[in-house]
Amino acid sequence: MKKIIGISANEVVDAGEVLHHLPISYLPAGYVRAVQEVGGTPLVLPISQPKEAKTYIDLVDKLILTGGQNVSPSLYSSNQSSEALSLLERDLFEIALIEEAIKQKKPIFGVCRGMQLLNVYLGGTLHQDLSLRQPERIKHMQSPIERWVATHDIFFEKDSILTQIYGSRTTVNSFHFQSVDQLGTDLKVTAKSDDHIIESIESSTDKHRILGVQWHPDFSYNVNDKEKGVFDFIVNSF
């Protein structure tokens, strides 16, 4: 029987002229296609009230938290930079999804922002703006380089479950302004970049099954077998 994979959606208030400036709920197709190609059934979870989280988690076997806006600094820091690139409504709903998934002992895979939000939920903090770190050795927001192009190396710890897919090192894409700073409770760091940015985290306890990556396998699953392999692992083994 196919696994049902809940995938968190995003929202925009004005979709532009092509879509008549409508407000839309949306999800980058890479997540959907990757889950389908490895044998899962994707179920899109639109931003909703936190009280609806249980209804959604009851429907799924596993949860994917997707990329998108920055996590609201108000959730982890008293020293806030601009909230302009965040969406608190989304943060609060996805935090409720995390809480319910953990309660139901369902695995969670966080991508980019999704990994950061998992860390914040478990009491960790984030670097709010990597461009302020001096010197900036690696460009962690690689745009305008195409999204599927891998631009920097990362290095895995020997005990990472991802070594079975990537080996001890791999090269990944990079599209983020924020990154994990102080690690949340019951998590361990399992990969870093050359400039010591945390690139993957995993559960350090059997209280929950959590895996997070800072890069976007959804951008390159169709051109890189390893990135497709991580979706295969999430859907069929995690």
State the predicted function of each range.
Residues M1-F109, V120, H127, S131-T163, ...:
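N-terminal beta1-alpha1 cap of cysteine-dependent amidohydrolase-like domains
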Residues L211-Q214:
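Active-site-proximal beta-strand elements of phosphoester/diester hydrolases
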